[in-house]
Amino acid sequence: MDQIVRHLKSSRRVFLASHTQPDGDAIGSLLALGLSLERLNIRSALYNESHIPAVYRFLPGVAAITRRFDSQADFDTAVILDCGSLKRIGAAAAAVSQIPVIINVDHHVTNTGFGHLQLIDTSACSTAEIVYRLIKQLATPIDKAVATAIYTGILTDTGSFRFANTNSAAFSICDEMVRRGVTPSEVAQHVYGTYSMGRIKLLNLALDSIEISTNGKLSLMTLTRQMLRETNTLPEDADGIINYAKRIQDVRVAVLIQENGNGESPSNCPGRFHVSLRSDGTVDVAAIAAAFGGGGHCNAAGFNIEADMGELKSKIFDLAQKI
């Protein structure tokens, strides 16, 4: 970490990015480090290819996150946050790979070890936990804005302290963030508080799509673009829906197949899908995701794939027989 701290303090212009379809950890880590570098008068750009979900737009500094990579900016350093591989940042990956020094900050067990400098801790509950430690080493003050970003990252990646990755650091750091001004009830209200009627209707369609493997150990939920159109919702409205499939009695692995693209391909043509996997702790879904070119954690992982929907479902149900 000392080498990374020294390098950041000597950097002229830093590019910071997190993974597409960002969650609270990806956004919180990005903002916390970006705001801290700003305190050091280090010029930086915050990037995420995807729209920021509405539930995270309350975070201080979120308006500074851009979806456009400035190829003329002459960055000397890139910090890639919460990404198992560089390609997880999306279309800008090839251009970003040309930045002289790439720093990889992550907690995923499937991290490829990309970059010139790595700060990877798979025992951390979240990337926000690692960013907290990095900020401490940078010796910049943690004000309420930075504290809110760190708290949100830890809260969401531990499932409100319910997931198996919840560790003692999650509680001690969040305790400190509260003492620095974070109001837990306010953050919870923004992140979990209210659902639109469209999201409720989308949940109804998603629940109706659930299929169970013959051995009862795997549940599969489908979310199509047509469902989004019918309910006037966005992909971000599906956040957390997979947990309903995971709570079914005897289910060890829950799968959500989410259609990407415009959803207008003929049924007999391959489509593009994002597949999310969740485990009850008895199955390593990161290994399953890795077999499809993806990654993640033992209990939460995912991958992108171009395939026929029927064939994809068959492959997934075949896996269920090995559970």
Model-derived regions: residue spans:
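Short alpha-helices
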Residues: V105-I173
